[in-house]
Amino acid sequence: MTFRIDAHQHFWQMASRDGYWPPQTLDAIYRDFGPQDLEPLLARSGVQRTVVVQSLPTQEDTRYLLDVASRTSFVAAVVGWVDLKSTDAPADIASLARDPKFRGIRPMLQDLADDDWIDDPVLEPAIDAMLAHDLAFDALVTPRHLPALLAFARRYPRLRIVIDHAAKPPIASGRSEAWHVAMSELAAHPNVHCKLSGLWTEAGPHPDLLRVEPYVRAVCDWFGASRLIWGSDWPVSRLAGHFGDYGAWLAWCEQCCDRFLGPDARARVFGGNACHFYRIDRPSGDQHAQ
């Protein structure tokens, strides 16, 4: 059986979000989502493990996810949140890292007014703590953040960085020249990886798959079979209308990877690379984790 990891999914409880995204107008995702909702989708799609990623900029949300992960066998890793510019960041990171499933940190860069927030030496104590605890960095960015992310990646070449949702390219508008230039520059750095996730959502509620495909081909070309990591972005993926079907997104991505990287890349893109990036123990006999 093929070993698959969904390297990007979310859980949340609306009562604890205090008006934070999603708004009530997004009725497809304006409700609680937990392991009981995702487990049947994983079973039908042949996905064995997941990485749950924060969606609130609070440590309370991170602690909630760690608690859920401790009671959910299919959750292999948690990517949480820490205020990386706080003087308490190193201690907060050390505290969270005591949990064996805490494997990464994601500042919500897309929601910050300062495009260059990440390009700041003030982050150094926090990044040093991440390196000391062998943690990964998830970059939730849009194209406007990519120049600063490039400077950040150059400053910390030992830090494992993954670009969530391929930096949310402007698929709907098609104005992607700046995205192409910046992503190709980032891909030249071996510590930078890319998540094959969220692209149907970025294409709008009724995506034209022929318009999405060139973006998949681009990240396949840039990051190759060893630095591309598949994720569902569930339940946010439900915003893509009937294209938000979990199994349909997985199958389409597998077909694209077969075409652009070759069938032998599947084991890495859909499982092995996530194992390596997030330090997840792989099943015995799976030789494609790196």
Curated annotation (Swiss-Prot):
The protein, known as: L-fucono-1,5-lactonase
Lineage: Bacteria, Pseudomonadati, Pseudomonadota, Betaproteobacteria, Burkholderiales
Pfam family, any one: Amidohydro_2
Species annotation: Burkholderia ambifaria (strain ATCC BAA-244 / DSM 16087 / CCUG 44356 / LMG 19182 / AMMD) (Burkholderia cepacia (strain AMMD))
Family label: Belongs to the metallo-dependent hydrolases superfamily.
Catalytic activity: L-fucono-1,5-lactone + H2O = L-fuconate + H(+); L-fucono-1,4-lactone + H2O = L-fuconate + H(+); D-arabinono-1,4-lactone + H2O = D-arabinonate + H(+); L-xylono-1,4-lactone + H2O = L-xylonate + H(+)
Function per UniProt: Catalyzes the hydrolysis of L-fucono-1,5-lactone to L-fuconate. Can also hydrolyze L-fucono-1,4-lactone, L-galactono-1,4-lactone D-arabinono-1,4-lactone and L-xylono-1,4-lactone.
Documented EC number(s): 3.1.1.120
Misc note: It was not possible to determine the kinetic constants for the hydrolysis of L-fucono-1,5-lactone because of chemical instability, and thus, a stable mimic (4-deoxy-L-fucono-1,5-lactone) was utilized.
GO molecular function: hydrolase activity
InterPro entries assigned to the protein according to its UniProt record, in alphabetical order: Amidohydro-rel (IPR006680), Metal_Hydrolase (IPR032466), Metallo-dep_Lactonases (IPR052350)
